[in-house]
Structures are given as C-alpha cells and as structure tokens.
Amino acid sequence: MPQRSAPNAGAKSGPLERQARAALRETAHTLAQLEKRAAPAVAAAAEMILGCFENGGTVFFCGNGGSAADAQHLAAEFSGRYLVDRPGLPAVALTSNSSAVTAIGNDYGYDEVFSRQLESLGSPGDVLVAISTSGRSESVRRAVRSAQELDMTVIGMTGARGGDFAALCDVALVTPSDVTPNIQEGHIAMGHAFCLLVERSLFPRGTPAAGPRRTPRKPRGVRPGTGPRTRSRA
C-alpha cells in the first residue's frame, strides 16, 4: 500500500494552511477581546456561582446543539473537578437526561424541555447558566423565565446579537462575535474562567490533579476555604 509522504515543513504554504491560519487568527482575535470586554461579567458570574455553592445550592446548565455540549462540559468541571483534587460540586446539565428530554419534548413540545425540568429540580437560590449563541433559542428563553419564577439567579451566555436575551439575565457573558463557532469558543473560555475562580475561592489549599482519583463525598453546603478531605492509610 503506497505511503503518503509527510508535508514538507519548509515548503511554501498551500491554500489549506492559509485558510487554517486565517481561521485561527479569527479565533485568537475574538478571544483577545474577552479580557477587556468580558472580565467584569465573568467575575460577577463567579461570585454568583460561589454564593450558590456556599449556601448549598445547585448550578444548572442548558443549551442546544453545540451549546448543549458546552453545558455538559462546564457542569462536569464542577461536579468532577477543574484543576485541583477536591470534593465534587452540585452542577447539573439539563441536556443530559435523554429520557426526560424526549418525554417532555414528546408530551409538551421541545420548547419546554429545560423549563419543565427546572420546575421539578430548581430551588430559590440556585443558579441557571443559560447558553444560546443567538439568544433566540425558545427552549433556553423559557428556562430563563422558569428560573426567574423560582427566584433563581440567571447567568446568560450569548453572542454579539443576543442583546434581548442578555437583558433577560442577571449577568450576561457575551462573546463579541456573530460567528457561531467563535461565539462557542468564547463561551468555553469564559466558562473555564469562572470555573477557575470558583474552585480557587472554595479550595485554596487544593492540590493540582495528577490523574484519576476518588474523592470523598462532601456535605451539601460548601464552606469557603475548606480543602479536600483525605483518608489516612492504616
């Protein structure tokens, strides 16, 4: 079977490499704007999430398509770990329960798939992180309204054209772009930032995670400054 030769690193760049450079340059430009434009909102979101966890609450995430993947990704950073070994934190992606999503979608319509779950799972003081690149996803907007009726705090994540959606939320993390993939890249960058801030605040004595490791369960409330508990070996 003939072997394909490796690309010649010294050769003149071809059209695909030029397109790759342009795509990466656009991503870098979008992300570079976040420090100046989004840092205050990211800090505010971290403060809201921190207060929720300290008071024994749960952070919920929702979104559609790529934003559903982002919702699950960010929920896992809390319920698993981000950078340090520590107890898990109560975070739920409303996109994950396929039975609930399909049952509600079938019986009530897709627009209700997140709001209906919040009605049964959410409590006053909880936080909803609602992700919509366009700001027009009706299922996400209804989740925002349900969260507000439950006296939850709402953090919105959207793009440059999501002004109406952003206005519905207590704080909005806006990627300054109208290109969907770039908006999503900004969302993950900002999400990772608030995960970092919350984790550092709750677990300042946490140790960098070296690999898979079981951690003990924690009580429902998390006191600030407490590090992960360890089990001594007999």
Where are the predicted features?
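Glycine-rich phosphate-binding loops that contact phosphosugars or nucleotide phosphates
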Residues: S67, Q72-P208
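Hydrophobic beta-strand scaffold residues
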Residues: V59-F60, V154
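YjeF_N-associated NAD(P)HX repair module
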Residues: A189-A234
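Residue-level recognition of alpha-helical structural elements
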Residues: L16, A38-A41, S67, Q148
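A short, well-structured juxtamembrane/interface segment
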Residues: K36-N55
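Generic N-terminal amphipathic, Lys/Arg-enriched alpha-helix
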Residues: M1-R37
